[in-house]
């Protein structure tokens, strides 16, 4: 099974409506997918795969042709100075540093504002380039924010957005296996204990993104119009297009 894979079809939005099924998907990276898994993915008819990883993260085989999807790799990354220093410190940094979700919060604060990746994503949503899939490495942070923005655009409640985001707690074993292959085994206990925010999701982190949107723009409608050029009229049309009566 492809890690952290799911769709948001069926989730409730305003007006006693739900997101239509078979349109918006999310997952972790596809590099480790088996041929059988890729064949199942191909059956979904996904036209576009947004890959929010940095170039250096794209180490494995790119299987997008096998699923019949166009691959758009647009990094959705913010350079968090503290985390950048830890990365440069290599494996030995794990012995001396311990991070909390608060150390990751600056990344979440900056991601939804002025981000070229999400601007491209919203343009695709408006232009109807669906079905689409969003992914990064674990499919929990950058892809998580992308899916959250789509849900907010379509009128999902705060509770629905948070609940969907928190489903990514299930991806922890996958992340541990990926990181475990990239660092010496002797450092595994330190990595898993000292860098826990890299392995799971925190409600407080998505709250950081949502609070930044509201503090900057006042409401989501203004955010979508100012950041992405999606007016109230266009948003209404998108809700009609991508949702249906429950």
List the predicted regions and their residue ranges.
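Ser/Thr-glycine-rich phosphate-binding loops at phosphate-binding pockets of nucleotides
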Residues: 138, 142-143
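Cys-dependent protein tyrosine phosphatase-like superfamily
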Residues: 1-133, 146-246
């Amino acid at each position: 099974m492809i890690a952290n894979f799911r769709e948001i079809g069926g989730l409730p939005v305003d007006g006693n409506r739900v997101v239509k099924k078979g349109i918006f998907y999310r997952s972790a990276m596809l590099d480790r997918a088996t041929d059988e898994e890729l064949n199942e993915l191909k059956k979904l008819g996904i036209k576009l795969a947004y890959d929010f990883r940095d170039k250096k993260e794209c180490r494995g085989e790119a299987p997008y042709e096998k699923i019949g999807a166009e691959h758009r790799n647009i990094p959705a990354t913010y350079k968090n100075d503290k985390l950048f220093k830890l990365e440069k410190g290599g494996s030995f940094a794990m012995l001396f540093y311990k991070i909390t979700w608060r150390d990751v919060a600056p990344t979440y604060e900056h991601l939804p504002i002025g981000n070229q990746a999400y601007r491209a994503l919203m343009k695709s949503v408006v232009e109807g380039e669906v079905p689409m899939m969003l992914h990064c490495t674990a499919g929990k942070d950058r892809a998580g924010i992308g899916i959250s923005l789509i849900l907010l655009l379509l009128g999902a409640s705060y509770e629905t957005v948070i609940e969907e985001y928190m489903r990514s707690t299930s991806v922890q074993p996958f992340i541990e296996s990926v990181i475990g292959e990239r660092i010496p085994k002797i450092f595994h206990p330190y990595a898993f204990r000292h860098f826990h925010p890299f392995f799971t999701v925190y409600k407080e982190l998505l709250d950081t993104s949502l609070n930044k949107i509201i503090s900057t723009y006042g409401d989501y409608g203004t955010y979508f119009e100012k950041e992405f050029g999606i007016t109230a009229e266009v948003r209404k049309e998108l809700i009609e297009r991508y949702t249906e009566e429950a």
